[in-house]
Amino acid sequence: MDDSIMDIKEIMKLCKLNEEEMAKYLDLSKNLDHKTDHSRAYRTMMNQTRRELLKYIGTDIRTDRQIEIEFQTDIEQLRYHLSMLEQLFYIMNTESGWKATPRGIGFLENAIMGE
């Protein structure tokens, strides 16, 4: 096994979802059609802004305002990109702010960080 690839236990330690949020994430993402999902994920993550958003959220909790200040972009455009990441279960909008899911952290750590 490649030691540079982060395993699920490491990913779960980094995830900021609380127990209730994790249960919701697991429920929503349990019936993914992996073939269709892979294609959607590929197309979605080809967008530089979305990759940068996922990096910025990372293992932190980010508010809409923090994201808006960091990206200096129209809030409606940011909401569109955040929505795309949320539909793929890479991030969740929680009461405390945007959080990366285990899937998002896995993608971030195993695919994006090498950029």
Regions found by a protein language model. Give the residues of each.
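Residues within the helices of the helix-turn-helix
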Residues: 64-65, 83, 96
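A short acidic, leucine-rich amphipathic alpha-helix
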Residues: 66-70
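Minor-groove-contacting beta-hairpin "wing" of winged helix-turn-helix DNA-binding domains
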Residues: 96-103
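Short amphipathic alpha-helical interaction segments
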Residues: 71-87
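Short capping segments at the starts of secondary-structure elements
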Residues: 59-63
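Short alpha-helical segments that sit at the start of domains
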Residues: 23-52
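A short, conserved structural fragment
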Residues: 86-96
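Short, amphipathic alpha-helical interaction segments positioned at domain boundaries
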Residues: 105-115
